[in-house]
Curated annotation (Swiss-Prot):
One Pfam assignment: Ppnp
GO CC annotation: cytosol
One Gene Ontology MF term: uridine phosphorylase activity
Function: Catalyzes the phosphorolysis of diverse nucleosides, yielding D-ribose 1-phosphate and the respective free bases. Can use uridine, adenosine, guanosine, cytidine, thymidine, inosine and xanthosine as substrates. Also catalyzes the reverse reactions.
Catalysed transformations (reactions): a purine D-ribonucleoside + phosphate = a purine nucleobase + alpha-D-ribose 1-phosphate; adenosine + phosphate = alpha-D-ribose 1-phosphate + adenine; cytidine + phosphate = cytosine + alpha-D-ribose 1-phosphate; guanosine + phosphate = alpha-D-ribose 1-phosphate + guanine
Protein name stated in the entry: Pyrimidine/purine nucleoside phosphorylase
EC nos: 2.4.2.1, 2.4.2.2
Keywords noted in UniProt: Glycosyltransferase, Transferase
Family statement: Belongs to the nucleoside phosphorylase PpnP family.
Name of the encoding gene: ppnP
Gene3D superfamilies documented for this protein: Jelly Rolls
Keyword Transferase: yes
HAMAP family cross-referenced by the UniProt entry: Nucleos_phosphorylase_PpnP
């Protein structure tokens, strides 16, 4: 079953799904802007197109991730994103 999500007045949209091969995940697109997300479960985020500048809890500073690159966000935390151009991502929810 697909679950459609919309955040930040439509600037971020995603489709959640369950996959036999990767488990619970979502794929989405973010318009240019700055965003703060909170997590319930640990997350593995992979950039598909564009780039994401990310501030992860416990990190020493902002890091840029480009297509094919992955970052991890701990459970029960917040992380900040700066998006310079429309960008897409795959988010896997880890257990």
């Amino acid at each position: 079953m697909l679950k459609f999500n919309e955040y930040f007045t439509g600037k971020v949209k995603s489709i959640g799904f369950d996959s036999d091969s990767i488990g619970q995940a979502s794929v989405g697109v973010m318009e240019k802007g700055e965003y703060t997300f909170s997590t319930a479960k640990p997350e593995e985020m992979t950039v598909i197109t564009g780039s994401l500048k990310v501030l992860i809890p416990g990190s020493s500073g902002w890091e840029v991730f480009n297509p094919g690159e992955t970052f991890y966000v701990p459970a029960n935390s917040e992380f900040n994103l700066q998006v310079a151009e429309a960008s897409s991502y795959l988010c896997k929810y880890l257990s």
